[in-house]
Amino acid sequence: MVLSDGEWQLVLNIWAKVEADVAGHGQDVLIRLFKGHPETLEKFDKFKHLKTEAEMKASEDLKKHGNTVLTALGGILKKKGHHEAELKPLAQSHATKHKIPIKYLEFISDAIIHVLHSRHPGDFGADAQGAMNKALELFRKDIAAKYKELGFQG
């Protein structure tokens, strides 16, 4: 899967909006993930006790983790597909330590698309959504290949 220069530009344009409030976007993404797929919450010992959206919104730890997740993703997206160095340690930790299935990366990708659309409807039209979907699919495909190298069937 290859994105054109124009598609990468669409991805990076919307990502610039994310970077104005990485922690807030990250928190929204995780809340969307956990509400839509409560089973994903079980992978996070630190957040298992958060049962309501209000509890999630009040959690500084959740906000910090959202910041960590989207900061890492932003670093990967900015590499425009040349993300081997960034992906390797991420795949290692997610496969061997956290045991995060690829399906969960699909879930969080959907949450990212939803949050971007809800926060930036005027800047995240069909073209930008399509480009971001392709970029996230490329990320998932490449991390799945790393998982396979590590012997994780996630």
From Swiss-Prot:
Chief subcellular location equals: cytoplasm
Q: List the disulfide bonds.
A: none
Q: Which UniProt keywords apply?
A: Cytoplasm, Heme, Iron, Metal-binding, Muscle protein, Oxidoreductase, Oxygen transport, Phosphoprotein, Transport
List residues binding nitrite: 65
Positions bound to O2: 65
Phosphoserine: modified positions: 4
Please tell me one Gene Ontology term that the record gives under cellular component: extracellular exosome
**Gene Ontology terms: biological process:** removal of superoxide radicals
Which PROSITE patterns does the entry mention?
GLOBIN (PS01033)
Q: According to its UniProt record, where is this protein located?
A: Cytoplasm, Sarcoplasm
The record's family statement is: Belongs to the globin family.
Mind telling me what this protein is named?
A: Myoglobin
